[in-house]
Amino acid sequence: GNPIEMLKSSIGKFNHNVSTLNKGEIYNTRFLNNQELLCCRSPHVTIGNILVAKNTYVGEIDTYFNLTDEIVCLNSINDNILERLSGCDFDSDQMLITNDKILLNAAKKNYSLFKVPTSNVHARKVQRKYTSEDQADLDIRTSNNLIGEIINLSQQLNSQLWDKANNYTKQTGCSIFDLYNT
């Protein structure tokens, strides 16, 4: 997430309008400063779940955090990066980060055309207490979560979309974007 902003928030000095990383920037010590990177997080639900970002060195982050090559800092302030990365959050999510030119060029080819999926479903806040009963209730409710089934269905639909897109293109000479208008 935004590590410096989290620190500032903890001491009451967070400014919602200022971020050490700008929109479209990440910081990862594995890659060079200003290097363009492709990021994909699993589960990769749909074609809009890719991020092309610039690796941006932030000295202030290095001052306060002991980053390794496996840690990435990103800006989620006034940016849809969490949706773009398929519901990314800050609890040890994993993501592929690469500077491979073939993958980068393929990602950038239609980057602005693939819309980022957004749910806009606001969760109902449930007041819980730290009791055995509330923990058991939460365990039961989360065990019945359908996220796995939803992700599997999404993958099947994506496979069908790309199969149809490739066959449709071969048969008609039209592009994948024409599918959305039929």
Language model features: what each stretch is:
Residues 1-98, 102-115:
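Core mixed alpha/beta domains of very large multi-subunit molecular machines
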